[in-house]
């Protein structure tokens, strides 16, 4: 169906947002020690309370901004929402470059969290410009870009002076903003605003087809059906296509639509559980506390080097996950990767508590754990968020789920330090293991396979009612 080149190039440009977000989010990890020391580059050393705020302000910023992301997606569109958020990241680096005051650094970190709705915007944007056959891989690439940004941040932070790191971050973020202007708006967004001709031009651009080709007309008709779903009969996509006339659906408010659409409600609840469970598999803790964890787990190795290798492992796993998303499917990835995450956490927990094996076992599973997590919980929920919702609820449901993600991140980071002091690393990993196994079980029972399906077909999977058991 046309060329995939412009879809891939468009995805690559959108993924510059993820790279820049990975750079700015990882930046605090290797500056905490510097900011606490007497040789700090700031106007004074940070206090313990300020360090706590420094590590968590990004989550607070995300909680503030995410509720507005759905509104901006609908009002500004996917393209200009991307530009708006990317400009916020550039502003972070401008503040850090111009000021050395502790207060301004904390404000910059807060602003980085406010700009983090990039994760929501980019996933939606990518899913709407790519055809079904590559949608999963391209959407998963968004999370790969974040891992690459983390890796880049660790490498630059390890080899560049503090000021030079700030300049590089600024240049990368400004370049990302400029590149986004080259893209065309999502065809689904244009069609939802009644701009059918512009939507056809957008599809023609990304598919490299003539605007009057049959493929484009078919895709526009599919989008129209998605924008005018039959909520009363829960008709299958095949039944919808057999209807001779496609009358415009009654315009419903968001809550009226949710009340009438069983498939939308079920898709939301299932994704909510998967997203929450994914956060509590615990990788965010390992990312933030990488250096002290490596110091305890592998005392003979350099914590900084181990942290860089952690980012390398996650980047590699992200690339593998992106490849497998449209090959193996979303559901198997979530199930088997969660099982692998649980086993890794169980091994790490017993090793850190009982020290039953040599140090290399700890080292191996310290990298297997984030790789398994990235292949499953770190990728699949974001692919599902981008593809399972009808256009009428997509922005708001996606916003709620990403908001929940940040709430869970804040909770786990807030309770982690006292929990660690109370029970130690071993039992903490037991908790992560238990939640990983529960995620695998839940995914096996409730998560449908959405590989290669359009949103109509996906909604049909969620609309299916369980068949009653027949007694013999």
Each model region followed by its residue ranges:
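Alpha-helical transmembrane bundle of multi-pass membrane proteins
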Residues: 1-204, 232-472
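TPR/TPR-like alpha-solenoid helical repeat scaffolds
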Residues: 214-229
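Short intracellular "coupling" helices and adjacent cytoplasmic loop segments at the cytosolic face
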Residues: 206-216, 232
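Generic detection of long, well-ordered alpha-helical segments
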Residues: 193-196, 213, 217
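Short, flexible helical or helix-coil boundary motifs
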Residues: 210, 227-230, 465
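AAA+ P-loop ATPase catalytic core
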Residues: 203-206, 223
